[in-house]
A protein has these predicted regions:
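Charged docking surfaces used in two-component/phosphorelay signaling
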Residues: 14-22
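Acidic, metal-coordinating helix/loop segments flanking the phosphotransfer/catalytic sites
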Residues: 29-48
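Receiver (REC) domain active-site loop signature in two-component systems and cognate sites
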Residues: 55
């Protein structure tokens, strides 16, 4: 099972990569929403996208809306992982099609718990 980590911070991508690889996911990475969209358009469709909101070129919100416009990608689970903590931003992301929302800073358990709720992880392993 693949996870696409979308964040302009290499350090954050590394943190998220460590968390999801320990769960058994294979990872792909993108530094912005456009790079992530290019992965999807090339035929590499992951089970999960972990998405930052604030990125250059294409932000996470725009990425979510574009993914939801394409019926071929309807099964991709989208989880925002961002510093945007205003209630309105959270509602906006979920209304656009994100499944979950985690606010930075976070603990690894926060990510694992959300993935368990989404059915992507069972007993600490990718389902």
């Amino acid at each position: 099972m693949h996870a696409l980590i979308i964040d302009d911070s290499r350090a954050m991508r590394s943190i998220l990569r460590r968390i999801v690889t320990e769960l058994g996911f294979e990872t792909l990475e993108a530094g912005n929403g456009q790079e992530a969209l290019d992965h999807l358009e090339s035929g590499t469709v992951p089970a999960l996208c972990l998405i930052d909101w604030n990125m250059p070129v294409m932000d996470g919100y725009t990425f979510v809306t574009k993914v939801r416009e394409n019926p071929d990608w309807r099964d991709v689970t989208l989880m925002m992982v961002t510093t945007e903590s205003e209630h309105g931003q959270i509602v906006r992301a979920l209304a656009a099609g994100a499944h979950e929302y985690v606010i930075k800073p976070f603990t690894p358990d926060a990510i694992v718990d959300k993935l368990e709720l989404l059915g992507l992880v069972r007993d600490g392993v990718a389902a």
